[in-house]
Amino acid sequence: MPAILEIPLPLAETEITTTGQTFSGTNLLRTYIMKALSLRLFVLIAALSIALTQSARASNPVVDWNQIALTTALTTPGTQIYLTYVNLAMYDAVNAIDRRYQQYGPEFHGPRDASKEAAAISAAYQTLLYYFPAQTAALQAQYDSAIAGIPDDQAKASGIAIGQIAAARIVALRANDGRGASVPYTYPAAPEPGVWIATPPAFAPPAMPWVAQMVPFTMRSASQFLPVNGPPDLGSRQWAREYNEVKLLGAVNSTVRTPAQTEIALFWTANPVATYFGAFRQLAVDRHLSISKSARLLAMLSVAFTDAGIGCWNAKYHFSFWRPVTAIPNGDIDGNPETEADPTWLPLAPTPPHPEFPAAHGCATGAIAKTLENFFGTPDVKFTINSAATHTTHTYYTVGQLETEAYWARIYAGFHYRHSLNEGFRLGHRVAKQLNQDFFQPRHADDH
């Protein structure tokens, strides 16, 4: 993460694709080659590509049901929590059969010749059915279609039963975990120095304060990784530097933020759960991961994402620090002579409705980046992320590139100060480190 006050050029580190074109020399060469091919050869190659992609997806129900889970839960507050329930159920169901990794929930074993495909489908279906009974008809139709693709034999029957057990155990394990609880949170109606208030344009109430009190999946408590270094003192030079940085770079009418930096900021305003897990599913397909490894990857990433979110929300509602959209128009009340107020200042994009410190994208991205590095054993992981906000695609070649871009995106957007991002990434890294040490580990050295 950046340590000095400077504006990097993250675009030099990533490829950006828009309207189907990737701006790189490789893509240009590929375009000329494809134009030189005969139409018949092109059609054959395209058909083969589609067939291979469909085959890869059909053979990996873990990937398919991660998408189904996301679609099912997408409009429900705490989407990532439900996704984690489903991914853990699939992970435990598959591991009950092949026993390659530590199970997350209570240990149980099924026949080794049981169908892992049926187990994963059954586990995901039963978990979603429990949490989303109103969507029974749609889920039933998707389940019937998926399970029909598996031959009717004892292996299938055993797999279905194992999936049912895994789902029931995860549901029982997470009973009364605080999801959706009524947690009161009071905040001022008018600006006070350093204190969060509802922000324009919607002035929405604080989002999901109950997440701050949830029982985590791997942390000992929601506050285990509460940052020791809280927000900067309002009278400090550090506060003045960071205030003026986001004031300059994050303004809706900034004259110093480049078009490339604006695109980065807006790219990262898309729904982070949908954005990240779309990339993770494609990564599993691109790497040709087995069902077992796909289940482990998605379980690790979803737990890291969710626990980082729980720790982050706990810190947000503990410190309750003000956003730039509140601080900058009220710079004259913070007691710092170097923070000149601008009553007309607005950020590039609407500010999310929850306290500023620490940065949620820092917490989540830090946890995700380190978990990817731990899973693959290297920071050099190539993957692509699509943004529904900008309809552009960014390709990363290392997890460090992802972290750098996500870091600066929140400053360019006018959402966060530098210290908040530093502490957010630190929290996410700590979550990922503990997860990797204590959970989802191979039973044998050659099972990585």
Where are each of the predicted segments found?
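Short, Lys/Arg-enriched N-terminal segments with co-localized hydrophobic residues
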Residues: 13-33
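Bacterial N-terminal signal peptides that target proteins for export
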Residues: 32-43
